Amino acid sequence: MPRYKLTVEYDGTPYVGWQRQDNGPSVQGALEAAVLGLTGETVAIRGAGRTDSGVHASGQVAHVDLLRQWIPYKLRNALNAHLAQAGQAISILAAEAVPDAFDARFSALKRHYLYRIMSRPSRLALEANRAWWVSKPLDHEAMHAAAQMLVGNHDFTTFRSVHCQAISPVRTLDRLDVSRNGDLIEIRASAQSFLHNQIRSFAGTLKMAGEGKMTPEDVRAALEARDRKACGPVAPPQGLYFLQVDYPTDGNWRPYSKT
């Protein structure tokens, strides 16, 4: 069966998350319904990341197996037409034919996320579902300094959800940077894989550093405590964006991760 890689953009606001669930509309479910409407095929689409309810994506990647071959751009356009007709807040940015060995989840080398904080006194209107509003001033340089305590290979028990199903809490965090442009503070994180709620837990803890409530040493101590109670608040989902997934460029699609 021909396999296709899909690059997907979505507004996570109306969805219970990426993963198909019984308690509401999901991004995966909407995509599978679009495929069913287009081809009559019942498929199971696999995504590179299972974003939570309210989390957005500008570069989620998924793969799907279809019964016949498609010209990729025609598949993209046809799926987008079905998604638009259904009123879905989802767009297929690109479709690409890939070998059977390609797996959107397990072939991934690195995932990139962005967390957006709007730090200003006035409540958000245009950005209401696009960022975390923090009314108090935040010191982004203090946040960045604290973030560097988390970069590297660590046991991130402190920063994962109690409901996380990953076998191991150990991950290698390649990047955690904080920058500012006017009222907007951006936290950018990169790793091969993340634990459930890990980035939102980072964001909540770094907010406390920006408020002067935690020092970089406090953040390091929280990490080393391996205790969920040492974590700051879990930041709300609307500030989180799944930006991009990196894959091998040499065509070697062997599984790089089983997390």
Swiss-Prot record:
The keyword Isomerase applies. One of its GO terms (biological process) is tRNA pseudouridine synthesis. The keyword tRNA processing applies. Pfam families: PseudoU_synth_1. GO terms for molecular function: RNA binding; tRNA pseudouridine(38-40) synthase activity. The active site is at D52. InterPro entries: PsdUridine_synth_cat_dom_sf, PsdUridine_synth_TruA, PsdUridine_synth_TruA_a/b_dom, PsdUridine_synth_TruA_C, TruA/RsuA/RluB/E/F_N. HAMAP family: TruA. PANTHER family: PSEUDOURIDYLATE SYNTHASE (PTHR11142), TRNA PSEUDOURIDINE SYNTHASE-LIKE 1 (PTHR11142:SF0). This is tRNA pseudouridine synthase A. The gene is truA.
